[in-house]
Amino acid sequence: METYDKAKAARVWQRVQNETAADPTQGLQGLIAEEWSDAALYLSLSKRVQGPQSAILKKMSQEEQSHLACLKGIYTLQGAGRPQIPTPPPADKTSVSMLLRRCYGREMRCLAQYEARASHPEYGQIFARMAQQEREHCRQLLELLGSLPPEK
């Protein structure tokens, strides 16, 4: 009796559906760097603002760290080895408002990449969940930008 070969079955389904499953590790190094940078920046920004804004940024940092861990896990499971983690970004003295604007653009880019990967047969649900959280981060960034006092 022959055992089920998952790799052979996947190749057959790809031919039947005339699709090729994208390599989930392709481009992950860039996403890993983005999530690492965002997690560090949100934590840094949480120390520069007060009250509920600080708590929101701390929570966003924790969620970005979770995304980072998931991406590293996918990278490792796919046999790509351990991903290279970039060195922490230097402290940025740019205004909070300007940094939040930059973060919004980066969150939108990550959102687009996660949504594009959401149809992956093995990791699609993970990418869809991270896309949903990135969408929420975009909303939170807009609220934070709208609630900041005018800069002097």
Regions picked out by a protein language model, each given a short descriptive name:
Residues M1-K152:
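Non-heme di-metal
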